């Protein structure tokens, strides 16, 4: 180190590569965080980068209070905003939530306060008043907005209690207190459920569509909520229902479709799913009605959350208030244009506060994290601890893929599958079981077990037993063969086997479903998989990325259930779910229990996998047979009752067998015998 003068020291220069020379300077006083700083050498100035990641900034400006945003009472509303680099902050009050309306009521200065926050108290009852912040000339919505007007540009002050449906105080998670391995998760896009005219749902594409009961086809086959309830699943995972930016809420006539992975306001329900996006209280009230209706049907509600990136980083409200703070500089591991800097203290607080808010205010029972491998483990741990302090049964799981992201500091661990040991109780999607069963998700001609490839028997056995190498407990493995991403199960099979008959594809799809729904861990499947969901594009092609495809591609085709092959597949899924729920030995919680209860059986046919399971006072024999020829399977001693074969599944026996069982081609078989 060389001291240049009383205020400045020069540390050893460091050369990076062949052309860049980094020089590290140390100051004996703090720089202003609200002013642009430059270093000049011989008259050539260089602007200093933001200092968000310096220990001094975090120490000076980490705010830990619980009052960010608007705090309403009939007597007054208090606003608090975190804007540590701002020189001037003002609040604008509006009559409406329409960003095109010229209806400014007043503009008031806010006062700087502790830890980089600004505050103001508005006297009187301001319920229903809309507002924005003006931060050094940049207008922005409140990041902590509880609701907004149309298209999420103006926040709204709201008496949240006034939006509660009748009986909200006693509304609870119908599966609270049950282990995660008891869950059967059904992934649903809100719009897909109701858009078909055959759904007979009145509120098409709306929160309220998922509250309607008594909807059915002419033959009485239930649709909508009644269909989901009759299926036997325990949890409905909704694709993003927070406010996203890729749909113009003011133009419902355009029939716009999007999955919703374009976050705009994290704590606000999506306006296009409400019957009136112009009045902020409506979306809040209707989403609560939907949650209550699902709970009333015995279904827990999981919310798909997307904290890893935002719709447009430069336009995101947090970044307009604190420029660049919310996003990792120059990083695009999400492939959506930006990555969230979750490792920064106030971003972490924002994510934790948001999750606690949804669990408390909307009674959300679980959170599925999109690309959670871009979020740091500390943030996930703190979020789980904070939510579980008040709501101990809320589920946490997500996509733990390893992504290429540019962290703002080197000591950060990301929440990937490989970090499962640091995140007990957090589940990860098991892409191994997906690809082993159906084949590569990216290369349709790379086959899997149910599409005809010789199996990786050891890997498949590990998946069935819930002991995938990265999972510390079976509850950390979310088992699936289809989700909203990529092709549906049926389309993936059709692409892999273009010469296969429809009957063969159906048998293969049921085999895949049986493997997932009978494996240890947490079964998960895409809405419509139970009725052979397909997304055809014509000319033998299928839509493998329908995030903004029209309703004609994405809507569930309820009318198909009038045909036998669809009804039979639906009944098969119902039977598999019922059988799983009736047998605790299929839902074990610890590895030690699994190794004590389950024994893989050596099979002569390389396309056959079999397991013996002891528990609940009986023995189960589970057989998977992916060959196109039948096989004769020898049975252990005893009289065995068959509950599942390639065509039927349930809790009522289909027949009794001793000595051996003929297993049909491309099918599963499950038998039980008293122990």
Residue ranges of each PLM-predicted region?
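The feature marks proteins involved in alpha-glucan
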Residues: 48-76, 104, 112-212
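Short, positively charged and aromatic/hydrophobic N-terminal segments
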Residues: 22-23, 29-38, 44
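C-terminal beta-strand-rich structural cap/linker in extracellular carbohydrate-active enzymes
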Residues: 83, 127-129, 654-675
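Loop/helix patches that line or flank the sugar-binding groove of alpha-linked glycan CAZymes
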Residues: 474-640
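Conserved, mostly hydrophobic/aromatic
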Residues: 81, 133, 188, 228, ...
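Glycine-rich phosphate/pyrophosphate-binding loop
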Residues: 142, 147-197, 431-502
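Substrate-binding/active-site clefts of carbohydrate-active enzymes
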Residues: 191-362, 372, 379-391, 395
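Active-site-proximal helices and loops of the catalytic beta/alpha 8
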Residues: 100, 105-112, 254-255, 260-261, ...
């Amino acid at each position: 180190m060389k001291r240049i003068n009383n205020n400045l020291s020069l540390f050893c220069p460091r050369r990076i590569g062949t052309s860049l020379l980094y020089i590290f300077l140390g100051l004996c006083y703090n720089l202003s965080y609200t002013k642009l700083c430059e270093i000049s050498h011989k008259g050539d100035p260089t602007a200093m980068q933001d200092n968000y990641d310096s220990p001094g900034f975090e120490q000076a400006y980490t705010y830990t209070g619980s009052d960010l945003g608007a705090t309403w009472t009939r007597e007054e509303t208090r606003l608090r905003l975190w804007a540590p680099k701002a020189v001037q902050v003002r609040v604008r009050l509006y009559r409406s939530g329409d960003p095109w309306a010229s209806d400014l009521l007043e503009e008031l200065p806010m006062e700087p306060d502790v830890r980089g926050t600004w505050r103001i108290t508005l006297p009187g009852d301001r319920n229903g008043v809309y507002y924005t912040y003006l931060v050094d000339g940049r207008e922005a919505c409140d990041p902590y907005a509880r609701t907004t007007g149309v298209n999420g540009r103006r926040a709204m002050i709201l008496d949240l209690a006034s939006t509660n449906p009748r009986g909200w105080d006693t509304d609870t998670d119908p599966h609270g207190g049950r282990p995660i391995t008891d869950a059967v998760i059904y992934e649903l896009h809100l719009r897909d459920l109701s858009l078909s005219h055959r759904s007979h749902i009145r509120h098409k594409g709306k929160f309220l569509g998922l509250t309607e009961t008594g909807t059915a086809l002419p033959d009485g086959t239930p649709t909508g909520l009644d269909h989901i309830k009759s299926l036997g699943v325990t949890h409905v995972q909704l694709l993003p229902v927070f406010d996203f930016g890729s749909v113009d809420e003011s133009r419902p006539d355009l029939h716009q479709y999007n999955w919703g992975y374009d976050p705009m306001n994290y704590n606000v329900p999506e306006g296009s799913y409400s019957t009136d996006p112009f009045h902020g209280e409506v979306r809040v009230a209707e989403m609560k009605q939907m949650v209550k209706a699902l709970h009333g049907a015995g279904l827990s509600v999981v919310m798909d959350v997307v904290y890893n990136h935002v719709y447009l980083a430069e336009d995101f409200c947090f970044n307009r208030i604190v420029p660049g703070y919310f996003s990792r500089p120059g990083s695009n591991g999400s492939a959506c244009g930006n990555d969230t800097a979750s490792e920064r203290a106030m971003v972490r607080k924002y994510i934790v506060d948001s999750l606690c808010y949804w669990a408390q205010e909307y009674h959300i029972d679980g959170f599925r994290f999109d690309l959670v491998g871009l979020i740091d483990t500390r943030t996930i741990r703190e979020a789980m601890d904070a939510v579980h302090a008040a709501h101990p049964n809320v589920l946490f799981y997500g996509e733990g893929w390893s992504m290429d992201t540019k962290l703002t500091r080197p000591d950060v661990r990301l929440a990937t599958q490989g970090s499962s040991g640091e995140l007990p109780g957090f589940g990860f999607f098991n892409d191994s079981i997906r690809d082993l069963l159906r084949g590569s998700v990216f290369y349709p001609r790379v086959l899997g077990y149910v599409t005809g490839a010789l199996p990786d028997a050891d890997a498949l056995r590990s998946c069935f037993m819930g002991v995938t190498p990265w999972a510390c407990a079976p509850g950390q493995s979310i088992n699936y063969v289809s989700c909203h991403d990529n092709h549906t199960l049926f389309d993936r099979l059709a692409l892999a086997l273009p010469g296969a008959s429809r009957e063969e594809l159906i048998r293969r799809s049921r085999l895949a479903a049986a493997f997932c729904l009978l494996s240890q861990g947490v079964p998960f499947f895409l809405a419509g998989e139970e009725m052979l969901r397909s997304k055809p594009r014509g000319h033998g092609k299928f839509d493998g990325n329908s995030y903004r495809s029209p309703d004609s591609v994405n809507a569930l085709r309820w009318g198909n259930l009038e045909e036998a092959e669809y009804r039979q597949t639906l009944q098969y899924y119902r039977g598999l779910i019922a059988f799983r729920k009736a047998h605790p030995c299929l839902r074990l919680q610890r590895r030690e229990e699994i190794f004590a209860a389950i024994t893989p059986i050596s099979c002569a046919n390389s396309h056959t996998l079999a397991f013996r399971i002891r528990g609940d006072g009986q023995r189960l024999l589970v057989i998977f047979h992916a060959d196109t020829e039948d096989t004769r399977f020898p049975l252990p001693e005893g009289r065995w009752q068959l509950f599942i074969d390639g065509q039927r599944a349930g809790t009522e026996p289909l027949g009794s067998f001793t000595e051996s069982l003929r297993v049909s081609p491309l099918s599963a078989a499950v038998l039980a015998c008293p122990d």
